[in-house]
């Protein structure tokens, strides 16, 4: 006998009439008066379960089969036959059902066969992948992860594993998780009474990374095209549907490139991501369109088909000021765009993805290249209909004197000595962007809370599991 993934059986990768084995969990069991049980078996390989038809003549029918409830694990062997019912091409006429694991108390099983709120399921995050929604999210997340690496590999990028432990604050926001092996009950102090981090494991104050960008720039200026894809951390005390304390970031960097090259890369990247998920996960996307957001498929198709429209920040401000719409947040040159402004531009004004470029220097990071007007930097945000900003990027400041002036009071130059070295030895124009992976998954699936697109969310007051 051959063990098959259920997805392979439903894709007709086994011949009708052949003997097959599937291993998985019970989604449901229905018994007929004629002494036949219909068991829907799921193994996580695809959205659909496969039906196993079990006759009462099976030796362990009364002892095992009639004890099966939602969540029980089992191994089914039988003959693959064409399904006489609608909705599935094949089913299994079982010749053997092996009960592997029972659910102790079916009445209190937290994810029994009924619909639960996502808030409830966050409290049982160890069991929620057994539900339709979180199984689908997991498969989409996997598909997108593979698509990230495939896209960059095909484009000639090198994958750089940037450090999780760092002494740098790339964003300058100060929202850092400190890492220490010091005895909290007996902290060493300096003469001035401050904590003496020279006695710590790394000999200095150390944090969890907020971004791999600064590190990946170093490799960009040797390898030309690089990217990092890994976990990042923000100690931002924010309990919103858009924030996580631990999340994954995709950060490519390209040498000999300006802001337009960066925008081109971002557009190609997003189109590839969305096309892959539409092609490979149509079953899961159909579920999201039916149960989560009816627009998820059409808006991804829109992102794939339509050219991204580029608008200068100053032009965007004029559009918003003259559109006649009353916004909650003020629209003024020098202020950052809020989500409501971004969505108006993408959804109402353009009706397509928008890339806003050249933002005021005061609202952007020190490493972004100062434009000739001395007022703006070569920064961009990619705005997607239905969510607003999905990518943020910039051309990097490659001139040491300008970089030093931009660093100013935000950072200590001595801490960034190695980053400044990159401008001293063979500096070139280069650019890159950052994309929060969970925000991408939320956009693709229509899930409204990023806590529901990562296996075990880390948020303020929550590090369970």
UniProtKB/Swiss-Prot annotation:
Q: Which GO terms describe its cellular component?
A: cytoplasm
Write the Enzyme Commission number(s) for this entry: 6.1.1.22
Reactions catalysed, semicolon-separated, are: tRNA(Asn) + L-asparagine + ATP = L-asparaginyl-tRNA(Asn) + AMP + diphosphate + H(+)
Q: Which CDD domains match?
A: AsxRS_core, EcAsnRS_like_N
The record's section on PROSITE patterns has:
AA_TRNA_LIGASE_II
Q: Does the keyword DNA damage apply?
A: no
Compartments reported by the entry: Cytoplasm
What are the UniProt keywords, alphabetically? Aminoacyl-tRNA synthetase, ATP-binding, Cytoplasm, Ligase, Nucleotide-binding, Protein biosynthesis
Known partners and oligomeric status: Homodimer.
Q: Tell me which family the UniProt entry assigns to this protein.
A: Belongs to the class-II aminoacyl-tRNA synthetase family.
PANTHER family, per the entry: ASPARAGINE--TRNA LIGASE, MITOCHONDRIAL-RELATED, ASPARTYL/LYSYL-TRNA SYNTHETASE
Name-wise, this protein is Asparagine--tRNA ligase
């Amino acid at each position: 006998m051959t063990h098959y993934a259920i997805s392979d059986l439903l894709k007709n990768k086994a011949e009708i009439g052949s003997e097959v084995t599937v291993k998985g969990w019970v989604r449901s069991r229905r018994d007929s008066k004629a002494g036949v049980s219909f068991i829907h078996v799921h193994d996580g390989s695809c959205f659909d379960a496969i039906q196993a038809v079990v006759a009462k003549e099976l030796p362990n029918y009364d002892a095992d089969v009639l004890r099966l409830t939602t969540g029980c694990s089992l191994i089914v062997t039988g003959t693959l036959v064409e399904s006489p019912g609608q909705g599935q091409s094949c089913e299994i006429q079982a010749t053997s059902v092996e009960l592997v694991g029972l659910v102790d108390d079916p009445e209190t099983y937290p994810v029994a066969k009924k619909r639960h709120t996502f808030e409830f399921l966050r409290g049982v995050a160890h069991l929620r992948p057994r539900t339709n929604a979180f199984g689908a999210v997991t498969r989409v997340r996997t598909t997108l992860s593979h698509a990230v690496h495939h896209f960059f590999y095909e484009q000639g990028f090198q994958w750089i594993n940037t450090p999780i432990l760092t002494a740098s604050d790339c964003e300058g926001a100060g929202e850092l998780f400190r890492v220490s092996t010091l005895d909290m009950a007996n902290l060493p102090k300096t003469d001035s009474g401050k904590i003496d981090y020279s006695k710590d494991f790394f000999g200095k104050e150390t944090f969890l990374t907020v971004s791999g960008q600064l590190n990946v720039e170093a490799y960009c200026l040797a390898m030309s095209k690089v990217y990092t894809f890994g976990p990042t951390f923000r100690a931002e005390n924010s309990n919103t549907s858009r924030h996580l304390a631990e999340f994954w970031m995709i950060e490519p960097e390209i040498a000999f490139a300006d802001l337009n090259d960066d925008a081109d890369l971002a557009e190609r990247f997003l189109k590839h991501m969305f096309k892959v998920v539409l092609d490979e996960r149509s079953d899961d996307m159909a579920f999201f369109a039916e149960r989560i957001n009816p627009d998820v498929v059409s808006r991804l198709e829109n992102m794939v088909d339509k050219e991204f429209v580029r608008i200068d920040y100053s032009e965007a401000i004029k559009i918003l000021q003259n559109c006649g719409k009353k916004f909650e947040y003020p629209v003024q040159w020098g202020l950052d765009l809020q989500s409501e402004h971004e969505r108006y531009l993408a959804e109402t004004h353009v009706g397509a993805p928008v890339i806003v470029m050249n933002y005021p220097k005061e609202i952007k990071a020190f490493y972004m290249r100062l434009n000739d007007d001395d007022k703006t930097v070569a920064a961009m945000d990619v705005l997607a209909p239905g969510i607003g900003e999905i990518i943020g990027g910039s051309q990097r400041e490659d001139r040491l004197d300008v970089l030093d002036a931009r660093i100013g009071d935000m950072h200590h130059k001595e801490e960034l000595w190695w980053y400044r070295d990159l401008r001293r030895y063979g500096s070139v124009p280069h650019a890159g962007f950052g994309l929060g992976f969970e925000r991408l998954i939320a956009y693709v699936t229509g899930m409204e809370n990023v806590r529901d697109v990562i296996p075990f969310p880390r948020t303020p007051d929550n590090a369970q599991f």
